[in-house]
Amino acid sequence: MMQYLVVSLALCATICSAAQTRNMPIQAIAYLIGPVQSDNTQVKGNVTFTQNDCGQNVHVRVQLEGLKEGKHGFHIHEKGDLTNGCISMGAHYNPDKVDHGGPDHEVRHVGDLGNLEANSTGIIDVTYTDQVITLTGKLGIIGRGVVVHELEDDLGLGNHTDSKKTGNAGGRIACGVIGIK
């Protein structure tokens, strides 16, 4: 297990060094897809992550379709495993073992990216910046899973027992693995 960690860290350092040498941003992408629903809709699309320099903020572009109108929890999960669908991705990426929170909260999982809001036609096309995630290094997200949830994330502020663990965001309706672009 330790060998895999060392190899992963070395790979991330190499990617970061190569990108800086060429003065290019590091990019990663995840193609998300969910099961076909009873109304014949299917959540699908992609999430692109761009980091201009190692250690700087990550720009996130989300383009999805097939959602129900409203807010949906959006998280990085600890594993990039699709063996048993989205459930194989494990819990939210939380290396610091802290409570769930919102993207602008001081205390949050690394993977807590808040909510995405689908319009009346079920489309999300949004770009924003996250100050906690990184593509490389100790907290790098490359190779991890990204998940869109059925319900709105309560950002750890709700009274439900799942609030401090998952934001009570409900089931996983689409997921993908983050890979280097």
From Swiss-Prot:
- Sugar-bearing residues? N46, N119, N159
Residues that hold Cu cation according to the record: H75, H77, H92, H149
Q: Where does the chain bind Zn(2+)?
A: H92, H100, H109, D112
Indicate where this protein resides in the cell.
Secreted
Q: Which reaction does it catalyse?
A: 2 superoxide + 2 H(+) = H2O2 + O2
- Matching Pfam families: Sod_Cu
Please list the GO biological process terms of this entry. Answer: removal of superoxide radicals; response to oxidative stress; UV protection
Gene3D superfamilies named in the record: Superoxide dismutase, copper/zinc binding domain (2.60.40.200)
Q: What class of enzyme is it?
A: oxidoreductase
For this record, the Gene Ontology CC terms, alphabetical, are: extracellular space; plasma membrane
An example molecular function term from Gene Ontology annotations: superoxide dismutase activity
Signal peptide (UniProt feature, chain positions): 1-18
Keywords from the UniProt entry: Antioxidant, Copper, Disulfide bond, Glycoprotein, Metal-binding, Oxidoreductase, Secreted, Signal, Zinc
Disulfide bond sites = C86-C175
What is reported when this gene is inactivated? RNAi-mediated knockdown results in reduced lifespan and increased sensitivity to paraquat-induced oxidative stress.
Q: EC number(s) per UniProt? A: 1.15.1.1
| Matching SUPFAM superfamilies | Cu,Zn superoxide dismutase-like
List, alphabetically, the PANTHER family matched.
SUPEROXIDE DISMUTASE CU-ZN -RELATED
Q: What family does the entry list?
A: Belongs to the Cu-Zn superoxide dismutase family.
Task: Please explain the role this protein plays, according to its UniProt record.
Answer: Protects the extracellular space from the toxic effects of reactive oxygen intermediates by converting superoxide radicals into hydrogen peroxide and oxygen.
What protein am I looking at?
Answer: Extracellular superoxide dismutase [Cu-Zn]
Q: Give the organism, scientific name.
A: Drosophila melanogaster (Fruit fly)
Upper taxonomic classification of the species?
Eukaryota, Metazoa, Ecdysozoa, Arthropoda, Hexapoda
